[in-house]
A protein has these predicted regions:
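N-terminal carbohydrate-binding accessory modules
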Residues: 154, 158-231
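Substrate-binding cleft of secreted/luminal carbohydrate-active enzymes
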Residues: 427-504
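Active-site region of glycoside hydrolase catalytic domains
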Residues: 292-428, 437-457, 480-483
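An active-site-proximal structural segment forming one wall of the substrate-binding cleft
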Residues: 211-232, 242, 246-276, 283-317, ...
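Acidic/histidine-rich helix-loop elements
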Residues: 188-216, 244-248, 287, 406-432
Length: 516
């Protein structure tokens, strides 16, 4: 799915979800702490490189581009026992601000409400929107077959894996590990929020709450596990509090680690990625050296921070941004630039594997998730997409599913399509099974595990019955082909972050039934 269209899902959902507090009760207080006083130089890491400014994705007239300004060197002094003063950068401002101390408990938290302006503007089956994360939803053509393909449900893993000499890393294949995950859910619109230019004094918590989420507590995370989910995908925008030399603020890293810790302690798997991250991805075709330097620094730091974590933590190379329409537009009918665009993604994914494998600790054996081309099924199954070389053979591929986009994305008609309010015809089901059979044949049958890192549907113009039918059908058909389905969710759409439970019990039951 392409990244522009999923913005519309979130933009449609967000107004009803912008909350003012987190009221979830906790057995113990969860505290977020930051240094007593850290000076923040609000200048982007790119400001010294004079990269031409592109319009932000919050501007609906642009195509997911963002100002990658000049790079300015700053020295970051870190100690474990003293206060730290560091020059840091944040998007689009040159004023100096103070990164004030935050002390937040689980029972009393103010969540920042953000008003986002959304405009659907697309051409050739694309919708550009704002407010949240971005996705391109493309409707993959169904196979020309006249009957729906059938798939035999694979057998479950026969025996429990043994633990290797490396602490926390079991002798388990990635295919077995993905199967063990079961079904999952995303912690969406939380740690990946970005472009929060309305926040004058950016802090860890202000980013976390900028798109409507309350401060995440341990009880919220435990609630996902109690619902029955086996894996929590944690999207992260790492550039939010980053110095000019691409050093991630230690408090930002600590907060991600805290949420990962809660996830693992609850018994779930965790997936951590680079998620959109303010749009610098768009510059890879024109400034690959600079972008690759930033990408490398981010993954070096993540790998180091989590190097001793067990195999229940998986890294994902990127989100949906691996595809560049400035080089190749699939709707143009031309193949010019296609090989180059695929080549950039293949290079990024190989760099990702190489960085993690050389990082030490448990990383040489860590299971990794490789983002497909725009995480689109049809494009990821293209022969130009190549899985990276990995001597450990511990890589899975990630695809997303928002097909048909007129049903999953649109809540009202657009110039590229008519909003669809129902799903479930023989043609609809065949499209789903054809797409998943394609993934199975291209990857699963060749020994490459698959995680459906996102699937979802806008809810505003659909009945609960239609929402249940679509989501449960995707989960069931995916799981029956050994694909792990991970539901895209943002604050209080499906999971209530105040009550720490799933809002529609019948929908949850049907999704979990995919495993039976």
């Amino acid at each position: 799915m392409n990244l522009n269209l999923k913005k519309l899902i979130a933009a449609i959902m967000v107004p009803a979800m912008l909350l003012t507090s987190a009221a979830c009760s906790s057995e113990s207080d969860a505290e977020i702490t930051t240094p007593a006083e850290v000076t923040v130089d609000v200048t982007t890491p790119e400001e010294s490189e004079q990269v031409s400014e592109e319009s932000s994705p919050v501007d609906s007239s642009s195509e997911n581009t963002q100002t990658e300004k000049t790079e300015k060197t700053s020295e970051t002094t870190k100690t474990e026992e003293t206060e730290e003063t560091t020059e840091f950068s944040e998007v689009s401002s040159e004023e100096t601000t103070t990164f004030a101390e935050e002390t937040t408990t689980a029972s009393t938290t103010a969540a920042t409400s953000a008003t986002t302006t959304t405009t659907a503007a697309t051409t050739t089956a694309e919708a550009t929107s704002t407010a949240t994360k971005t996705t391109e939803a493309t409707t993959t053509s169904a196979a020309a077959a006249t009957t729906a393909a059938t798939t035999t449900k694979p057998a479950e893993t026969a025996s429990a894996p043994t633990t290797s000499p490396v602490s926390g890393m079991r002798q388990i294949t990635t295919m077995e590990l993905v199967r063990e995950m079961g079904v999952g859910i995303n912690l969406g619109n939380t740690l990946e929020s970005c472009h929060v230019t309305w926040i004058s004094n950016p802090t860890v918590s202000s980013f976390e709450t900028a798109w409507g989420s309350p401060i995440i507590t341990e009880d919220i995370i435990k609630g996902y596990a109690k619902c029955g989910f086996g894996v929590l995908r944690i999207p992260v925008a790492w550039s939010n509090l980053m110095s000019a030399d691409y050093t991630i603020h230690p408090d930002y890293m600590a907060r991600v680690k805290q949420i990962v810790d809660w996830t693992l302690d609850s018994g779930m798997y965790a997936i951590v990625n680079i998620h959109y991250d303010s749009g610098w991805w768009s510059e890879f075709p024109t400034n690959k050296e600079k972008c690759m330097k930033k990408y490398t620094r981010i993954w070096e730091q993540i790998s180091e921070a989590f190097k001793d974590y067990p195999d229940k933590l998986m890294f994902e190379s990127l989100n949906e941004e691996g595809g560049w329409e400035s080089l190749w537009n699939r709707w143009s009918g031309s193949t010019n630039g296609k090989a180059e665009s695929f080549g950039i993604l293949n290079e990024i994914n190989q760099k990702f594997v190489d960085i993690v494998r050389s990082a030490g600790g448990n990383n040489p054996k860590r299971h990794l998730l490789i983002a497909g081309y725009n995480t689109d099924i049809e494009l990821t199954c293209d022969s130009l997409f190549v899985m990276p070389s990995d001597k450990e053979n511990r890589c899975a591929v990630s695809v997303h599913y928002y097909t048909p986009s007129t049903f999953c994305i649109l809540e009202e008609d657009a110039d590229w399509g008519k909003a669809k309010t129902d799903w479930g015809s023989a043609e609809d089901v065949k499209e789903l099974t054809d797409n998943l059979n394609k993934v199975k044949a291209h990857f699963i049958d060749k020994g490459i595990p698959v995680i459906m890192g996102e699937y979802g549907v806008s809810t505003g113009n659909k009945t609960p019955e239609m929402i249940r039918l679509f989501l449960s059908s995707v989960a069931k058909e995916a799981y029956s082909r050994q694909i792990c389905p991970v539901l895209w969710d943002i604050t209080n759409v499906f999971y209530d972050r105040q009550q720490c439970n799933f809002k529609d019990g019948e929908l949850l039951r049907q999704i979990l039934a995919a495993k039976s």
